[in-house]
């Protein structure tokens, strides 16, 4: 599963923060595979019009490369601030797939998208509240 959480990284539990940092890098790779299989127009025609956590979550971000670059920088900064060990050499898009049009667009999360993702995060935390940590400390 690949997740892009949309909320400010400061809101994320340590586990969600690190997982998103690791998984966000899957979007450019998935895009490259999709372009190879379907072509540019085929990929563009399948991008969902609105944020979703279901089928289409990854493809929703295919044309939002600038957003992902900004998001990746925010995730890295928050990992650094919290003192979480991560691969500082790791790049979001080493092949530059998302740097060119039509893949390099921006995105601003809608209130509805933020509501959806916050609900999902709360559901996940409720399933294992003793497992989650924030800044290295248990949340309960």
Feature names for model-found ranges:
Residues 1-140:
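Extended, charge-rich alpha-helical interface modules
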